[in-house]
Amino acid sequence: MSETLQDVQLWILTAVLLLGAGTKAVDRTAQGPAVLLPVPLRRPFTVAHAAVEAGLAAGLLFCSGGAAYAVRGATAVLFAVGLVALVRLRQRDPEMGCGCFGGLSTEPIGWRALTRSGLFLAAAVATFGLPHSGWAALVHATPWHGVLCAAEVAVVAVLSPELREAVVRLRSPVPCELREVSRKQMVRRLHASREWHKQRPLLASPEPVDTWRHGCWWFARFAGQEGDREFSVVFAVEVGRRRPDVRSLVVEPPAE
Amino acid sequence: MAADRTGYIHDRRRLTAALLGPEAAPDPHPAPAHVVRGTLTDISPHMLGLATPEGERRFILTPQTTFWYGGECAPRELRPGQDVLLRCTPGAELVVERVWADLARATGVITAVDGDTVTVATGHDRAPVTAVIPYRASGRMRVRHPRLEPGYLFDAVGVRDGDTVRALIPATTQPPYPVVETPRRPPQHRSSAQVAGIASWYDPVRGQDTDTDPDGMLMGVAYPALDRTGDCGPACDRATPCAPLPLLSLGATVRVVNECTRVFAVLPVVACGAAASHFCDRCTVCDAPASGRIAELTLAAFVALGGQPESGCWSATLTVGGL
């Protein structure tokens, strides 16, 4: 029973560290303990923090023997330092989120974040005596593992305000008129459209001469030529939909 | 190449309207006749002469005409050669209601402080401004700007004094943290074509050559949510504004309503409002609850919509069509 509980801690810690690394890599703006550092160091610290978490997650899953001790010790140190940093951050800036899961951790640091951090520290310490790796435990998993894992996931979920934030974001994503998009992404969507293929023979060059944004629409203007006649072809591509509405227009230059 | 780009930007509104409908890009309103800017040529108790890009013009002063030059003042305190902005009585465009002389403003992030001199970065597309805080204004400036240190926000209205701005009236209450430590704005999940907030002003010509440069009377807005991938460019230093403003590019037109006077105008986006994007303040002029700067109007547009430049702001509603 005790070993089953230790196995489950390995999986939970691996999943938490991977999620933490992933969310920090997606949103690299400095949050949580990173704001205790001088400004130039915050972003590199966030990237390094994500890399360390990913490395420890891999170590917990695959290392056994002496290497496993080192990885589990490092994981415990990471959570211990994290807990101290959260307490310090809470004193300095009570409105600040913990940044544990990147941009999802927006709720001010409270008893839930601190309890969760303490729980993970205890989980890391509990794995010290285990001889095998997380992967080996996974291969030989029993129904008891499943029950304990589900119970611990439920506890962690109760202690995680990020879940609510994630649900809110999934249900109501950033409205299209506020969403930042890259030019490359919009050009790709334009090239995949029927309008592009219809107007393509008219274009003098595939590079737009002007691009601009109007709320939910991204516009690209191309130089067009047919014989001696010169004109412009303008495309409007909708932002935010997987299959965007694309409109096009051939515009003659204004009469002199 | 630059002329090409200007031409393309000029065409954007027409092309947007052609593809999304006329309500997406309404025609901008022309400069109103009752707001005039130029260089003062002469002033007497009853007449005021102004050199404007359209030529010499003369206006009538009445006992009700008020004057501002760093504060309420008498007409005899104005001198020929000063940059002067007039608001005339609507319907009687030769009769002056109020006169502002050498208006100037410093809005942005403090980059250096040397005694009573503050250097302010006003955005990636504008030159930095040097503001000098005279002793008589230092008390009220300190109340609203407790941290005159690099990295903190600064916004003050004053008068132009050569290449510097004499900062006399604070135009914001400075946040207690530097710009880089501004709390992250929570992601917006709701939006609307109509956004409430506050409108401030900037001077596109910085008080220079107002007798010859028509941009002194430019009617437009510097927009704090200019599209980063296009016009804002690689040096873009705008922040995500705290009001949910739709992303736009130069050449778009927006409808701006002064909620204090209920006067409105359709204005083109003519510049990036990078400095304004950092401010999430409120305007005390007519006590509206909305916060965040949604538009930085050109000085002429701000006054044309009924604003008092010395108060720095008014509550505004901004509408973008065709979203």
For the regions a protein language model found, what residue spans apply to each?
Chain B
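A cross-kingdom feature marking solvent-exposed beta-strand/loop segments within repeated
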Residues: 24, 58-76, 94-95, 127-146
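Disulfide-stabilized cysteine-rich extracellular repeat microdomains
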Residues: 45, 55, 64-66, 115, ...
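Secreted/periplasmic proteins
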Residues: 1-28, 34-37, 42, 77-88, ...
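Short aromatic-glycine-enriched beta-strand elements
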Residues: 45-50, 115-121
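Hydrophobic residues embedded in beta-strands of well-ordered beta-sheets
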Residues: 48, 93-96, 118, 163-165
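Glycine-centered tight beta-turn/hairpin loop motif at sheet-sheet or coil-to-beta transitions
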Residues: 54, 124-126, 262
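Short domain-boundary/entry signatures in modular proteins, especially
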Residues: 32-33, 95-107
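A generic structural motif
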Residues: 51, 121-123, 255-259
